[in-house]
Regions:
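N-terminal interaction modules that seed assembly of large macromolecular complexes
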Residues: 1-40, 170, 174-223
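Terminal low-complexity "docking" segments
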Residues: 25-28, 32-68
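Intrinsic-disorder-associated interaction segments
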Residues: 7, 24-27, 42-45, 54-57, ...
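Extracellular/secreted glycoprotein ectodomains characterized by long, lumenal stretches
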Residues: 24, 43, 59-62, 97-98, ...
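Non-Sec secretion/translocation targeting segments of pathogen effectors
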Residues: 107, 239-241
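Extended, well-ordered protein cores
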Residues: 66, 75-155, 160-168
Length: 241
């Protein structure tokens, strides 16, 4: 008789694709690998990943692992949560459009709906996610699992809340300004002073020694961003002339 694993996850839509997984040593390795990658996703990453799963409808655990390694192939627009906001975003991004033409096309909702009809994609609590023209790479072919940190660049994960500590959100750092704004919008706050930090987790243990004092999430993100950029610059190869 084959044992079966029932997977629970905070990732939207994931459970229905991993509801019953036949247990084997290989499957447990794959589940453990996926669990590590999910561990370093924040609230927005989870929403995007769940949306990608819903759009792509993976058939196997291998497919889901490959999706987790191809997240950069999907387009995420933080804060774009309605057809109206999508239409506004698309027009703002087209700086070459004449003012008269923009005025004629100022039906933002219609523009957003037309775009979705042509390109697909779905809205979620934090924004809009759609596919791209790039082909997905088969990073995992069923034999050797890829690097668990493949294309995951966060250094810290912060838990924040407003009001009830059990109703918390997570944010991985460094984060872009648009991603931070999308989280504030989802939390219903205008600035970071309106929320409190519940916990912080460090991906690389040695970074605990580096972590300086900070007065806000925004300041911490600036410090982490600067530190990561400095590390990247030191790792860049020097070309000999």
């Amino acid at each position: 008789e084959t044992a079966t694993a029932y997977v629970e996850s905070s990732i939207p839509n994931l459970r229905q694709y991993l509801y019953e997984v036949p247990v084997s040593e290989k499957r447990l390795e794959e589940l453990n690998y996926l669990a590590y990658r999910v561990k370093w996703m924040d609230s927005q990453d989870e929403a995007v990943f769940g949306t990608v799963i819903e759009m792509m409808k993976p058939e196997t655990l291998q497919d889901i692992i490959n999706l987790s390694c191809n997240m950069d192939k999907f387009r995420y627009l933080p804060g774009v949560t309605t057809e109206v906001k999508l239409g506004e975003h698309l027009l703002k991004g087209n700086a070459d459009m004449a003012m008269e033409e923009q005025a004629a096309r100022s039906n933002y909702e219609g523009i957003g709906k037309d775009y979705i009809k042509k390109h697909g994609g779905m809205f979620h609590a934090f924004g809009y996610t759609s596919g791209s023209q790039e082909e997905l790479e088969p990073i995992y072919r069923g034999k050797e699992l890829p690097d668990p940190n493949y294309k995951q660049t966060c250094s810290f994960k912060v838990w924040v809340y407003k009001g009830n500590p059990y109703d918390n959100y997570t944010l991985t750092l460094p984060a872009t300004e648009s991603k931070m704004d999308a989280l504030k919008s989802a939390m219903g706050i205008s600035n970071w002073s309106k929320c409190k930090q519940l916990a912080i987790q460090c991906r690389v243990p040695t970074l605990w020694d580096w972590l300086p004092e900070y007065s806000s999430i925004e300041e911490l993100n600036d410090l982490v961003t600067e530190h990561c950029q400095g590390m990247e610059n030191r790792q860049e190869p020097v070309l000999e002339m």
